[in-house]
Amino acid sequence: MNYKVLERDARLGDYYSKKLLEERFAQSEALPIRDALGYSLTWCPCAVPSALLEDIDKMYRQISITGIDTEVSIEEESFHSCRIEGAATTQEELFNIFKAKRTESKGDKMILNTYRAVKYLNITKKRDESTLIQLWKIVTDGVCNNPGIAGEKFRSGVVTVGTHEAPEPELLEYCMLQFFQFYHGANISQPYIKAAILHFYFVYMHPFCDGNGRIARLLTTDFLIRSGLDNFSALTLSKTINETAPAYYQALENSENSFHDITSFIQYILKTVYDNLYEVLSNQNKHVVTYTDWEKIFP
């Protein structure tokens, strides 16, 4: 849902837009996590079809990772996550990067760093502020943009990404507290939805001067694995995000609205998981569900 367009049209007197906004507001529920100014994020549960979640569960149960090289999957996850951030390295060059440890370009280094970050998460049990700071150091080692606002822990300056102006640096401690209270809290029982909320919030607060997108994607997969969905260690969600990058950024932008409603981003992540699982199963010649383009169905 594009709130900016609807709110503009409602201000211009469009009855349909006004009515749609009123209905969406009435259907919204507060989430147990607040933005930098203390407003609760919201979502609209009725805009997330139960059939989508059921199909995801069906497909996940049929995934066989015995025929998937997990190491290669980690390499490809690192590659696609960095391609989203502008790395020019091609997939044909991955062999030289991982086998010969080639670091000729910034993109090469970004990919190797992201690979190292996955390995770090695999052996680290803690999920707290210190873990994120170490993760940031690994991801941006030798390739950090905006080092002038790196700060002692978090960024020390204001950051604007597209139309999003991240919270002021002095509000980041509060945001980080919100993030981990939600992360460790017994709140949203559906792991895919909770992973989407965590992903959005991390990108929203943008705690570091660089590497936030890569870290958010790492944390998404990591959270799913830690929720008992171990097969995601062999899947590459960033591949699907890379292939649908404009929709990824549009979903983030649509989730910046006066209602604090992040349903658009939750829908995007669920569709990403669905499409990724469907592709993997198709490659394994397994046809578990009839493909649905959920983008056309989401209200």
Residue ranges of model-derived segments:
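FIC/Doc superfamily catalytic core
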Residues: 1-299
